[in-house]
Amino acid sequence: MAAPFKTLVEDYPRYLKSFELFLERSSEHQCMQDFIHNTLPDILASIGGGRSVFNVMGVGSGAGDIDLEMLAQLHLKHPHVKVDNEVVEPSNDMLYKYKARVSTSPDLAYINFTWNKMTASEFEKQWQEKTPEKKMDFIHMIQMLYYVKDPNATVSFFRSLLEKDGKLLIILVSGESGWGKLWTTFRKQLCYTEMSQCVTIGEIKSFLDSEGVPYRKYVLLSQMDITECFTEGDQEGELLLDFLTEVKEFSKNAPERLKKEVLDVLRHPDCSKEVDGRIIFNNNLEVLVIEP
């Protein structure tokens, strides 16, 4: 049964504010950038089969900052290759920011961008109707499987689009992170049946294992300062609590008992550690690299 709250993503301006605060308070983008610069190039070395044009797809690309860093690494590894880049992103605001970033970025002439303002499921339907035979060299799905109805089916579909030497890259929170503990404890109270907000990489690995699909995995160490969550009435703390629970105005709308239980779990050693009087949440991510 769906939880009796409004989900944060229903209020896009508040979601965006909480997401931007999360990025400010966490090392998430830094750990992704480290992975992109230090590990991804070797993963990308074997794709493309010597073709002169690579087909690349970003699913849930957001404002494109991480996409463009990956494309830059791809270009360094394959400097003479052109790229057809499919961008799948349902948010007008994010697509606008992505396009603005492209327009002010030098040296992107080797990339042809196709903009798809739609969800992953809408894109899947369109793809099957228009270009079912087309194959991709590299697909990335970064922190987006929380927002699909069936994460396993979504992974299976996009994996089916890969060239024989293609790669599908997925980044999600680790099952051993603070998110894993929080969601395991409060799945019934906080998670929604129509959106799989509580999925971790552990569940995707279990699915792939059950299907006999091999993958490589990498852990990205990340943390987030959530100290303000424990100060009653602190606006930034309330925004972070919204982001952590995926509930709009959780502090105002949650029953006192649930609020106390959530805060207790957030302080628990399985979720966070105390460093110099600050509460530091375990925001570890994992990367899966999947082949056809």
Curated annotation (Swiss-Prot):
One Gene Ontology cellular component: cytoplasm
InterPro entries tied to this protein: HHMT-like, SAM-dependent_MTases_sf
Binding positions for substrate per the UniProt entry: E28, N283
Catalysed reaction equations from the record: histamine + S-adenosyl-L-methionine = N(tau)-methylhistamine + S-adenosyl-L-homocysteine + H(+)
A GO MF label: histamine N-methyltransferase activity
EC number: 2.1.1.8
One GO term of the biological process aspect: methylation
Cell compartment(s), UniProt: Cytoplasm
Binding site for S-adenosyl-L-methionine: G60, E89, I142
Pfam families: Methyltransf_23
Matching SUPFAM superfamilies: S-adenosyl-L-methionine-dependent methyltransferases (SSF53335)
Entry function: Inactivates histamine by N-methylation. Plays an important role in degrading histamine and in regulating the airway response to histamine.
Subunit structure: Monomer.
Stated family: Belongs to the class I-like SAM-binding methyltransferase superfamily. HNMT family.
Protein name: Histamine N-methyltransferase
Organism expressing this protein natively: Danio rerio (Zebrafish)
